[in-house]
Amino acid sequence: MPNILVLGEQPQFRTLLSESLWFDGHLVESVGDAAMLWEHLGNTQPDLVLLDAHSDGFGAMRLYQDLKQQFPDLAVIVYQCRNYGDVDRIKGAVADALVKHRFSGSGFNVSG
């Protein structure tokens, strides 16, 4: 089963996403900031990193670029749990694809 690392400053989103993946049978670890991410990557490399596009404490786009530069084969998905106002900017800046989910207090609802 793939090892997934979730990075996001918002504990409620990070926990919901981590628990959802864990219940689906994935090995999941989560961190709340970029320093913890780099520390984690110094010890072990996950199969996939999920990176919150709207973290205030670190530049998600810059962090994505740094991750891909240091670990070109590392799969990184940029996610967001807020409004879709910057979707085009995010996709144009770094993403090969963008998966959008609407967040409600009870979970994620897929939308196109």
Q: Which residues does each predicted region cover?
A:
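Two-component/phosphorelay signaling modules centered on CheY-like receiver
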Residues: 11-29
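Acidic, metal-coordinating helix/loop segments flanking the phosphotransfer/catalytic sites
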Residues: 30-48, 88-89
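A short, hydrophobic beta-strand element within the central beta-sheet of small alpha/beta folds
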Residues: 67, 73-85
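Conserved acidic carboxylate
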Residues: 8
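Acidic phosphotransfer microenvironment of two-component signaling modules
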Residues: 11, 32-36, 59
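Conserved phosphotransfer microenvironments
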Residues: 51-67
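Receiver (REC) domain switch/output surface
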Residues: 87-112
